[in-house]
């Protein structure tokens, strides 16, 4: 039986997920779509193969009798509202990051889900489904390079718009590292420090770019993450793990190497959707399969909360030159099953 999905938000990522669920994945059908811009919703349901009803409001999608599960891909500040509504309706919900705009908002979702008595929330952190990150985690978990001592990472975007601000380098960009590095190391953050090097001439008045974000984990691993969102040359994700007996690096995306005109070159991607397109497919297929099986296993509301707690500390650290403590409570047994 096909899982019937309702999608709230039909912008870039919402439309892409609707296409993915309709044309690529198995076992699900999009039956309801809403967007604050009705034209976006109508364009999404006009995609080949989509046969869905357009609703004026996200709550109408959640409450529709023929909708089994929800995808929240709307404007970030609405994520908490719609996720809580889905929990209240007893419907599994896949919420794109961020889960909420603050750690307090994420905690409200965690508390509501625990009160419901079963996992209903998966957060759209796709990197744990990426083949490269999975291979890197296996190296670490198998002890092939000994205990991880240091990590050097980078998250680089070609450019961002005038509405992108200094704090968004944390909440919209670094948020992926905040999740995937916890997962990669099976460790939590103890403290964070943010430094600003010389600023690129390609930024604007409301954005300090690049930023260097440095963490110490509870096990003592040191992590440096470069966040550079106007790097100009492409979309580039790097992760190097220095262990006791060796070094492991996140593999580069597959690309043709060219020798031409006295030069050796390899193309670099410019679109984040292309860099993790397979991971997006795998994470949503896993959500569909898990909902149908009655048990979610993907990134949880607690993972969303943990990332948000770290993000709040990072934003606080942007305003001081000193390290800031990351205070994450003990993970409830509910999320350790």
UniProtKB/Swiss-Prot annotation:
Keywords, ordered alphabetically: NAD, Oxidoreductase
Domain of life: Bacteria
Enzyme class: oxidoreductase
Gene3D superfamilies attached to this UniProt entry: Dihydrodipicolinate Reductase, domain 2, NAD(P)-binding Rossmann-like Domain
Molecular-function GO terms, alphabetical: inositol 2-dehydrogenase (NAD+) activity; nucleotide binding
EC number: 1.1.1.18
Reaction equation(s) it catalyzes: myo-inositol + NAD(+) = scyllo-inosose + NADH + H(+)
Similarity annotation: Belongs to the Gfo/Idh/MocA family.
Job description of the protein: Involved in the oxidation of myo-inositol (MI) to 2-keto-myo-inositol (2KMI or 2-inosose).
Protein name (database record): Inositol 2-dehydrogenase
Species, as recorded: Klebsiella pneumoniae (strain 342)
Lineage of producing organism: Bacteria, Pseudomonadati, Pseudomonadota, Gammaproteobacteria, Enterobacterales
Encoding gene (name): iolG
